[in-house]
Regions:
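Typically the conserved alpha-helix immediately C-terminal to a functionally engaged Cys/Sec
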Residues: 28-40
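Short pre-active-site segment immediately N-terminal to redox-active cysteine/selenocysteine motifs
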Residues: 12-13, 20-23, 66
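Non-catalytic, surface beta->alpha helical segment in thiol-disulfide oxidoreductase systems
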Residues: 72-100
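Structural micro-motif
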Residues: 62-71
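Hydrophobic beta-strand anchors of alpha/beta hydrolase catalytic cores
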Residues: 16-17, 47, 70
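Structural microenvironment flanking redox-active thiols in thiol-disulfide oxidoreductases
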Residues: 52-59
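A short beta-strand-turn-helix
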Residues: 1-14
Length: 100
């Protein structure tokens, strides 16, 4: 999984990753919201809800310092990130704003 995601990050397609753990309550709150984002704009951006324990190298590479943490990649570069718990609308707005 980690290799697959890394490959997508380096492509031209936008990639949104929500870094989480299963025992993080705010992370769990974000899961349904992230699914709504995926349903709304999944044809324009790859969306992953990723447990850092299953992708420790990627989490380290992205310098994940708090959870949940969302990181948006576009053309291989980090173009936006947040540690905030956001609404579907706020996430979509930021994704579209940073990938146009």
């Amino acid at each position: 999984m980690e290799f697959h995601i890394q490959k997508n990050i380096n492509s031209k397609e936008p990639v949104l990753i929500n870094f989480k753990t299963n025992d993080c309550n705010p992370c769990q709150m974000m899961s349904p919201t992230l699914q709504q984002v995926k349903n709304a704009i999944g044809n324009r951006v790859l969306v992953y809800n990723l447990d850092i324990n299953k992708a420790p190298n990627l989490a380290e590479q992205c310098q994940i310092s708090a959870l949940p943490m969302m990181v948006l990649f576009f053309e291989g570069q980090v173009v936006w990130q947040t540690k905030a718990v956001l609404s579907k609308e706020e996430i979509i707005k930021n994704v579209l704003e940073h990938t146009q």
